[in-house]
């Protein structure tokens, strides 16, 4: 089980090690980024038996990633785990924690996961690629929430053409375009007074 958080923040590091110590009580193998090794070793709550790995190897070897923080931490993990098709469990350390499943007061629920008593919610993601005019791929990534096309800091409308499977859908002038998954559409729908999509709906 990989544990991911910002170990530079004292409270988050303490929370992560509390989770690690709980899981070690069930003989789980705990993985943490090698980048955070010094901060973990210096923490008084460190009890040993944590494996420190390069970040890519950590995601490759983990059967489950536990992300402690706010929605941003979960979104970052989702981007890295997309091509690996492995589950993420969010534990909320932020304010709202829309995507987190647990609070720190609910750590006893982790025993159910160890016992195999859980279900996995599968969410649609966006496969993003930026291609230049000559067909060269400039950027590739994944997103659990949304992809935004904008003109940056320039206050000027841009000409947009939207295609779906090589078929032109529409042309318009605007300051940008937001392509959102059901998971990422919630805030946009609420701000527009619209209905909220079930995040498990397929794109």
Show which residues each predicted segment covers.
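N-terminal glycine-rich "phosphate-gripper" loop used for MgATP/nucleotide binding
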Residues: 67-71, 79-80
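ATP/NTP phosphate-donor binding region
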Residues: 1-64, 105-119, 130-141
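Gly/Ser-rich helix-loop-strand patches that form or flank binding pockets
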Residues: 76, 80-93, 98
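Gly/Ser/Thr-rich active-site loops/lids in small-molecule metabolic enzymes
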Residues: 170-203
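Catalytic core of DAGKc-family lipid kinases
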Residues: 95-175
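Short, well-ordered beta-strand core segments
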Residues: 65, 88, 177-178
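Redox-cofactor binding/interface segments in oxidoreductases and associated redox assembly factors
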Residues: 3, 67, 179
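Short glycine/serine/threonine-rich phosphate/pyrophosphate-binding segments
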Residues: 12-13, 72-77, 185-191
């Amino acid at each position: 089980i990989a544990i991911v958080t910002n170990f530079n923040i004292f409270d988050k590091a303490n929370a992560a090690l509390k989770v690690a110590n709980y899981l070690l009580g069930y003989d789980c193998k705990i993985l943490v980024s090698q980048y955070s090794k010094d901060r973990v070793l210096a923490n008084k709550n460190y009890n040993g038996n944590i494996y420190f790995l390069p970040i890519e190897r950590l995601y490759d070897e983990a059967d489950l990633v536990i992300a402690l923080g706010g929605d941003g931490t979960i979104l970052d993990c989702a981007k890295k785990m997309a091509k690996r098709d492995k589950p993420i469990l969010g534990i909320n350390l932020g304010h709202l924690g829309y995507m987190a499943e647990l609070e720190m007061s609910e750590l006893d629920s982790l025993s159910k996961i160890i016992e195999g008593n859980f279900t996995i919610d599968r969410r649609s993601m966006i496969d993003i690629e930026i291609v230049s005019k000559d067909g060269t791929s400039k950027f590739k990534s994944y997103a659990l929430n949304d992809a935004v096309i904008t003109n940056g800091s320039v206050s000027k409308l841009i000409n947009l053409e939207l295609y779906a499977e090589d078929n032109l859908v529409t042309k318009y002038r605007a300051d940008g375009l937001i392509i959102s998954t059901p998971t990422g559409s919630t805030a946009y729908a609420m701000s527009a007074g619209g209905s909220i999509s079930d995040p498990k709906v397929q794109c």
